[in-house]
Amino acid sequence: MEGKEESAVDWAYIESVLPLYGKALWLTLRTGTAGILLAALTGLLCAAAIHWRIPVLRRITAAYVEVSRNTPLLVQLFFIYYGLPKVGIKINPEACGIIGLAFLGGGYMTEAFRSGVEAVDRIQEESALSLGLTRFQTFLHVILPQAAAISAPAFMANVIFLMKETSVFSAVSLMDLMFTAKDQIGLYYRTTESLFLLVSAYLLILLPLSLLGTFWERRLRHAGFGT
């Protein structure tokens, strides 16, 4: 009986720390969303550079994609947070998380958008150019809307992947969900309760994203994209 009592979940404790986890959840969401938005913008610009076939930009973009996708986020965060201050560049934990996630995610978003852009028939681009549109106008108004629709499933998969990667932010002292759970375990030995709250918080973030991605993909299939 004593063993059962010791292993029982303390719901009163869970209720008492909900505000603490609420703050950590908001910080994780805020940092993750900012990083993902920057990653999407980076990926879009890189995909455009590849599409326009500018040799220098293509080489720089290719090198960036290889580095960002083939180095762990944790290593990137350590370089930003601990390495850059050695050359006089100091970055706070939240900014470090955003920059690191954007750097990692930009490589994945580049590939997602690039595949979408390449799936658009080149004849459409040639037709738009023959009508007097500039290359930028053609990309913005003709290619990008179709490429975005085609890339949507890969984009949402990347969003979910990157949001899960926020779990390593605690390594640079960002007081996110993982940091809070580890802190509570270390201070009060509330392992079961802390992990329960951690898992619940990430499910609260990721399940809606997963459902949105599935819904979006089905809508696009019905519309005739990505088939």
Question: Which residues fall in each region the model found?
Answer:
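Transmembrane alpha-helices and adjacent helix-loop boundaries
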Residues: 2-227
